[in-house]
Amino acid sequence: MKLFLHSRVWKLLQKQQTATGEHYSLDIRYLDKMVADIAVHAGNYPVQFDSAADRRRAVADLILLSGMLEIVVNGPTPDGGLLLRYARLNRFGHNLDIPGATDKAEGSFKRLLAGQPDNPEANYEYGLFLASSGQAALAISYLEKAISLGVSEASYALGMSYLALGDRQKAIVQLQEYQRYHPKDGNV
């Protein structure tokens, strides 16, 4: 398993010298690489790590990343892409039982969707968050919207949400739909 070490998080900050002085920016590709690495292990509940040490490193990285992004997204008009990444990280933090991550994920997804109600990824990930938080009934509308916006992966979470609510027929329909687009996925 490859997890990023806490000290490498600082590679996110890029410093450039300009005519007006130093300018700092985020290396989005590196950020996405780190988020994707954490997602492999904490994107779903229960989380899966090879060791307790790997989990501790992921928690430390996630807390640091979330804190860095929190500064950027707390302005009056945050970048939607960064707000989605922040919400996603806190969704993972929720899965890792990090204090405060649940509220941060919830607030970030709501804020993002208030400004971008047709954002396919935001609808999908908020639906995943709600479903994994024991709120399957609330997850359904977001997952349905994600599907209508082209996110075929949402069919699996929607099927599982229907199953959690005891609606076996709708669950089967959604899981079959998911399987149609993802025939090699052994989870169905």
Question: What function would you assign to each model-found segment?
Answer:
Residues M1-E22:
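Extreme N-terminal leader/anchor segments
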Residues G67-E70, K110, E144, Q176:
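Alpha-solenoid helical repeat scaffolds
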Residues G150, G166-G186:
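TPR/TPR-like (Sel1-like) alpha-helical repeat modules
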Residues E22-S51, T77-H94:
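Amphipathic alpha-helical repeat scaffolds of TPR domains
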Residues S51, L62-L69:
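N-terminal carbohydrate-binding/catalytic regions of secreted carbohydrate-active enzymes
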Residues R55-R56, M160-G166, D185-V188:
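TPR/TPR-like alpha-solenoid helical repeat scaffolds
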Residues G80-L165, R180:
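Alpha-helical adaptor scaffolds
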